[in-house]
Design a protein with these regions (language model features):
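Structural detector for short beta-strands of small beta-barrel domains
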Residues: 1-8
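A short, compositionally biased
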Residues: 8-15
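Acidic, low-complexity, intrinsically disordered interaction modules
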Residues: 15-126
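Short acidic DE-rich linear segments
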Residues: 130-134
């Protein structure tokens, strides 16, 4: 199933919204770990401009792809975090998602893994890793 995944600021986890099927447009799950294939990174410029104008976060960015659901999602994420590249998005700094180490813009990936973690202060945040197999 093709989905749109974003970090839910209120629930502090990833929300998974269906892009097809009878539940199209609805959140079908929440998860601390998500794995997607055939991915595109999406940012609504209008939503980003609203963040810049209001200085308040809103849902305007995320990743679309084919949702991989199953028992091995956690191990696939661990593999991605070792061999993949970390991706980040900050509407105050970037117009799009970027490779964290190089700040190179990124718009697609073969595989994307997302996981919630707690930072040093205990605040829950989302980590995103991507991998292209070309």
């Amino acid at each position: 199933m093709r989905v749109f995944v974003y970090f839910n600021l209120h629930k502090k986890c990833f929300s998974i919204k269906a892009l097809e099927g009878d539940r199209k447009g609805r959140v079908v799950a929440h998860s601390n770990t998500v794995l997607l294939e055939s991915c595109k990174f999406k940012v609504s410029e209008a939503g980003r401009q609203r963040v810049l104008r209001e200085k308040r976060k809103n849902v305007h960015a995320g990743v679309t792809g084919v949702w991989v659901n199953g028992d091995r999602v956690e191990s696939h994420f661990e593999f991605l975090s070792m061999v993949g590249r970390q991706v980040t998005y900050n509407p105050y700094k970037y117009e799009s998602f970027v490779i964290k180490a190089t700040e190179q813009l990124v718009d697609k990936a073969d595989v994307v893994g997302m996981k919630v973690f707690a930072d040093a202060e205990g605040t829950k945040r989302g980590a995103i890793y991507m991998r292209d197999f070309k």
